[in-house]
C-alpha cells in the first residue's frame, strides 16, 4: 500500500499563532515534542483522538479540519 503524506504547513501556522511553539502545543496535547515533530513530518500519523483534541485546543471549526489535517502533499 502506498504511504500518504499530508501537508501540515497550515497546522504549523495555527500552532504558532495559538501556542507560540510546537513544544507548548505538544505539552497541551499530551505528547512529547519529538512525537509531535514525527507527526508533522509524516513519520507517524495523528490518531483520531489527537485530532479531536487538537481541534479543541486550536479552536478550529469542524468544517476546516480537513484543511489542517488531510491536505495531501503534492
Q: Residues of each region from the PLM?
A:
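Residue-level detection of the helix-turn-helix DNA-binding "recognition helix"
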Residues: 41-42, 52, 70
